């Protein structure tokens, strides 16, 4: 709740910014939208409103800015749990970032295209682009986007679960946990850890599944996540 006034203040100031013109203003607007959606998943809807307000100005954006706009718009939609229905825009965005992007931008672009295929029920294509996304991650770099990397492995875990591939699911979730901790995202690290129980349950290892649930519940409670603790056990 403490975050909400900050978000609203940012939105008000950015609506004013969106009325300005020039490359710097466009860059600032995109950066602010990205910062807002990174606060938490709920704030992504505020970022979408901001980006929607900027949409009439897209013809004034440079190509690089338009590509970043589309990349961030898809990122915000994904965080807000808005389903994708077409891959046409993200295919163009991926093609652009393959030639012009940083490792983090390429990772995000491939990830978003994978999420598009997830939503249109093309699981093999989703996994292909999730894998491509993880290959872009430069884990030797200090600015590696571990927050995105852990989410990619988390999504891979979900797809492997749906395809009844428990060992692949466990492998993906182990990496999701690892990179969530690197991103200092304790809550999602614990959620990924708890999600491993379904794979052990599928394998008939009921005791292992119960141990994971119990440990996850204790860790959730230790870190103050009582809601998740009650769900876990």
Protein language model regions, located:
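A "functional boundary" signal
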Residues: 5, 11, 17-233
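N-terminal secretory signal peptides that target proteins for export/translocation
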Residues: 1-2
């Amino acid at each position: 709740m403490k975050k909400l006034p900050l978000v609203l203040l940012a939105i008000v100031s950015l609506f004013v910014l969106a009325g300005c013109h020039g490359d710097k203003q466009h860059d600032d607007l995109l950066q602010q939208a990205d910062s807002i959606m990174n606060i938490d998943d709920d704030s992504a809807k505020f970022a979408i409103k901001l980006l929607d307000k900027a949409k009439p100005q897209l013809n004034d954006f440079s190509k690089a800015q338009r590509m970043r706009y589309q990349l961030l718009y898809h990122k915000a939609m994904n965080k807000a749990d808005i389903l994708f229905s077409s891959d046409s825009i993200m295919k163009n965005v991926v093609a652009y970032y393959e030639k012009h992007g940083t490792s983090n931008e390429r990772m995000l672009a491939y990830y978003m295209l994978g999420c598009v295929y997830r939503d249109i029920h093309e699981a093999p294509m989703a996994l292909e682009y999730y894998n491509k996304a993880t290959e872009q991650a430069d884990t030797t770099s200090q600015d590696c986007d571990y927050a995105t990397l852990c989410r990619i492995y988390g999504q891979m875990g979900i797809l492997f679960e749906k395809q009844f591939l428990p060992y692949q699911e466990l492998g993906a979730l182990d990496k999701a946990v690892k990179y969530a901790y690197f991103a200092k995202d304790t809550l999602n690290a614990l959620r990924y850890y708890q999600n491993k129980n379904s794979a052990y349950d599928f394998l008939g290892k009921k005791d292992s599944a119960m141990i994971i649930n119990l440990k996850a519940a204790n860790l959730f409670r230790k870190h103050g996540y009582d809601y998740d603790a009650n769900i876990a056990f």
